Amino acid sequence: MATTDPDRPISLAFVGHTTPDLADRAVAYEDAVLALLADHGARVVYRGRRRPGQDPALPLEVHLLWFPTRTAFDAYLADDRRVELLRRFGEVFTSKQVVEMDAISGVTTDIEAQ
């Protein structure tokens, strides 16, 4: 169950699918929008892209993002610069999933070790 505690850190997994004709635009959008994370105290833990030659039906990008609080995540979603990027680029993904993740007990991540 997702936490609603505004002061608790959250980690999110993002999986984005797109078509070959939108792929370059999707990458440019992600380059721009992910750069805003630091202004909200957040960071990209992992960003990966499908290898060339793989089935284009597979996700184009997968991200793991960390936010210091839910309030920071909400502020990122409402950031006027992010809204403008969405307007400028349009919908670049044909399908996307965002999953709030909990760390698995007994496994230390780089974030937890810091």
Set out the residue ranges of the language-model regions.
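Short S/T/G/P-rich N-terminal loop/turn motif that feeds into the first structured element of a domain
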Residues: 1-61, 67-78, 102-114
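A common structural junction motif
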Residues: 33-34, 81-87
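Conserved short beta-strand edge segments in small beta-sheet-based binding/regulatory domains
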Residues: 43, 86-102
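Generic beta-strand structural signal
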Residues: 61-63, 96-97
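Short, intrinsically disordered, mixed-charge
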Residues: 75-83, 91
